[in-house]
Regions:
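Non-heme di-metal
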Residues: 1-204
Length: 204
């Protein structure tokens, strides 16, 4: 299905290690509003989406989120790859180091492991699209918080890129919601779920 290009969507070239920053940014790898959950959410939601154009959009964005996951992992890797033992101890990175050395492992900034309970697939068109729109806004807010903590332009620029893509995804999911509603009974979008109820004339 996929063709993998051996380059990032946006260049990441970090010169200075920073374990404290890595511990924050890793939340967008495996945290509650991170790229791992986003990719799994959209690539799972597409199967119960009966409208081809919307299912295609979920596939496109879910695929892009995998690229964003790779970017975040690269940022974390470059921030930690040249750490000295002293830097690990002083930065508070020791707890992570004990379990993972400097490997990239999915967790939130607070150390909570990635959990599939952080995202949902209800199999209901309206519910799932609202879930996706909310997810993009939460990710954007998280990137906003990260940007407030960054001084290194080598880190700031790729994070800005990722934040901008969350806004675009939010807008595209808004368009998808409109497309889905155009297919439904305009008098009551919640009368039935065409992803499950095979009766387009159902009304309440």
């Amino acid at each position: 299905m996929w063709s993998y290009e051996k380059r990032l969507q946006f260049p990441v070239n970090i010169k200075e290690p920073n374990a404290k920053l890595a511990q924050v940014i890793i939340s967008q790898y495996g945290g509650p509003d991170g790229e791992m959950g986003a990719s799994m959410r959209y690539l799972s939601q597409r199967y119960s989406m009966p409208f081809k154009e919307v299912a295609g959009l979920l596939t496109d964005i879910g695929t892009e989120e995998l690229g964003h996951l790779e970017m975040v992992a690269t940022i974390v890797h470059q921030l930690t790859r040249d750490l000295s033992r002293e830097e690990i101890e002083k930065s508070g990175f020791a707890n992570y180091y004990v379990d993972h050395t400097i490997g990239v492992w999915p967790q939130a900034a607070g150390g909570v492991p990635f959990n599939a309970c952080e995202f949902q697939v209800k199999g209901d068109i309206i519910t799932d699209l609202h879930e996706s729109m909310a997810a993009e806004q939460k990710a954007r807010s998280t990137y906003d918080n990260i940007l407030r903590l960054i001084k290194d332009p080598d880190v700031c620029e790729p994070i800005k890129f990722l934040r901008a893509r969350e806004i675009v995804h939010y807008q595209r999911f808004g368009e998808a919601l409109r497309i889905a509603q155009d297919h439904l009974n305009s008098r009551n979008f919640y009368a039935f779920n065409p992803g499950f109820d095979r009766c387009d004339s159902c009304e309440t």
